[in-house]
Amino acid sequence: MKIRVGVIGCLGRMGKKILNELITNTKVEIAGAVARLGSEYIGLDIGPIVGNNCNLGIKITSSISEVFESSDVVIDFTTKECMLECLKAAVKFKKPLVSGTTGIEGLNLKDYAAKVPILWSANMSIGVNVLLKLVKEAAKLLGNEYDVEIWEMHHNLKKDSPSGTAIEFGKAVANAAKVDFELNQYSHNNSNIRGKGGIGFAVSRGGGVIGDHSVMFVNYDERVELNHKAIDRTTFARGAVQAAIWLCENKTPGLYSMQDLV
């Protein structure tokens, strides 16, 4: 029996990619698709909208509750405000939730995850999450004798800075080095000399760059670089669908991440 997956934010860059990935994956089927209230696409079939030549029998709705009720698991790529509504619906309908929404500071995911399974990751790419494990290992092996610089570049419409993925890399380094992440961030906006063990962030925005990340460990003799470049958003969509399948099969309440999959 196929897993029924709902998609919140179905008309966004990621939403369309996820719908197409669901169409091609034999383990799942689309249960419903949500767009923002007032969208001109409400009531239309998702088939032509995602580039399919025929209707798929699924009409776009603005009702988050409706899609949660009809789904086995739901994938959300929206905004902080919309994700909050998804969290409430997940608890109400007792359905697992996968979310890649970033910029969610202030949302206490653990409170909701105590009642339903929730998987949140700033980046759903399998490659990025493998890189995250490598960064943790490098930080352990190199110790705090190296300055750590994390650079990221995204398209010119991305709002949060640094990216959620870059912050995850920074936290991974801090945890491995057993230092406080908040106290060891180095800001390039001040004139202070960089202290030992600082974790710096550099941000670039331009064009349609999907996502480039580089974590550098630097001392006076050498530089170790670990890099990832996203070529197509399909990598995030494929990871999100894999996460939905995994979470639905797991079904134990708790807060998970893509690190639990790789």
Curated annotation (Swiss-Prot):
Binding residues for NADP(+): R36
Gene Ontology cellular component annotations, sorted alphabetically: cytoplasm
Gene Ontology MF terms in the entry: 4-hydroxy-tetrahydrodipicolinate reductase; NAD binding; NADP binding; oxidoreductase activity, acting on CH or CH2 groups, NAD or NADP as acceptor
Binding annotation for (S)-2,3,4,5-tetrahydrodipicolinate: H155, G164, T165
Residues the entry annotates as binding NAD(+): G9, C10, L11, G12, R13, M14, G100, T101, T102, S121, A122, N123, M124
Active site as annotated: H154 (proton donor/acceptor), K158 (proton donor)
Keyword Hydrolase listed: no
Example of a GO biological process term: lysine biosynthetic process via diaminopimelate
Record pathway: Amino-acid biosynthesis; L-lysine biosynthesis via DAP pathway; (S)-tetrahydrodipicolinate from L-aspartate: step 4/4
Disulfide bonds: none
UniProt keyword terms in alphabetical order: Amino-acid biosynthesis, Cytoplasm, Diaminopimelate biosynthesis, Lysine biosynthesis, NAD, NADP, Oxidoreductase
Pfam families: DapB_C, DapB_N
Main location: cytoplasm
Enzyme superclass (EC): oxidoreductase
Family matches, as InterPro entries: DapB_C, DapB_N, DapB_N_CS, DHDPR_bac, NAD(P)-bd_dom_sf
Reaction it catalyzes: (S)-2,3,4,5-tetrahydrodipicolinate + NAD(+) + H2O = (2S,4S)-4-hydroxy-2,3,4,5-tetrahydrodipicolinate + NADH + H(+); (S)-2,3,4,5-tetrahydrodipicolinate + NADP(+) + H2O = (2S,4S)-4-hydroxy-2,3,4,5-tetrahydrodipicolinate + NADPH + H(+)
Subcellular location: Cytoplasm
Keyword Oxidoreductase: yes
Entry's EC annotation: 1.17.1.8
Function: Catalyzes the conversion of 4-hydroxy-tetrahydrodipicolinate (HTPA) to tetrahydrodipicolinate.
PANTHER family: 4-HYDROXY-TETRAHYDRODIPICOLINATE REDUCTASE 1, CHLOROPLASTIC-RELATED, DIHYDRODIPICOLINATE REDUCTASE
Family: Belongs to the DapB family.
UniProt protein name: 4-hydroxy-tetrahydrodipicolinate reductase
The organism of origin for this protein: Wolbachia pipientis subsp. Culex pipiens (strain wPip)
Taxonomic lineage from the root: Bacteria, Pseudomonadati, Pseudomonadota, Alphaproteobacteria, Rickettsiales
